[in-house]
A protein has these predicted regions:
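Aromatic "clamp/platform" in nucleotide-sugar-dependent glycosyltransferases that forms part
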Residues: 35
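A short, well-ordered alpha-helix in the C-terminal region of glycosyltransferases
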Residues: 81, 94-109, 118-121
Length: 131
């Protein structure tokens, strides 16, 4: 039984990249209520589609979501603050800026080229090579 005040569309496992992008682009925000995360791919995927995100201040989430710039970082285990984050994100007058900042963050920090360069720099540092 759905106790939420809006329709819920359950999704099965999605492996098709185009279908996944369409799903992200059909939503206004992405929320992750997880209390244990490192670097969630789902946040990166949503941000790459320009979707502001809401998550708890745990693991790598606060490194990914810039509080009040591309989403909302709620106090750890505070369901009230988490709900406030969802409300704030949905009602933010400058939602287009949130969306743009989410996309920019994904590209500037998590794109394949950026991540590959970070790995190369790390390997060069560890091996004492200069590239």
């Amino acid at each position: 039984e759905n106790l939420l005040p809006f329709k819920v569309y359950p999704l099965n496992f999605v492996s098709n990249e185009h279908q996944l992008v369409n799903i992200y682009n059909a939503v206004d925000i992405f929320v992750t209520p997880s209390l244990e995360e490192n670097l969630p791919n789902t946040i990166m995927e949503a941000m790459a589609c320009g979707i502001p995100c809401v998550g708890f201040n745990v693991g790598g989430i606060p490194e990914m979501i810039d509080h009040l710039h591309n989403g909302y970082v709620a106090q750890y285990k505070s369901s009230e603050d988490f709900a406030n984050g969802i409300y704030w994100t949905l009602t933010e007058p400058d939602y287009p800026s949130l969306s743009e900042q989410a996309c920019r963050k994904a590209i500037s920090h998590y794109s394949e080229n950026v991540v590959a360069k970070k790995y190369i720099d790390l390997y060069n540092k560890v091996t004492g090579r200069n590239a």
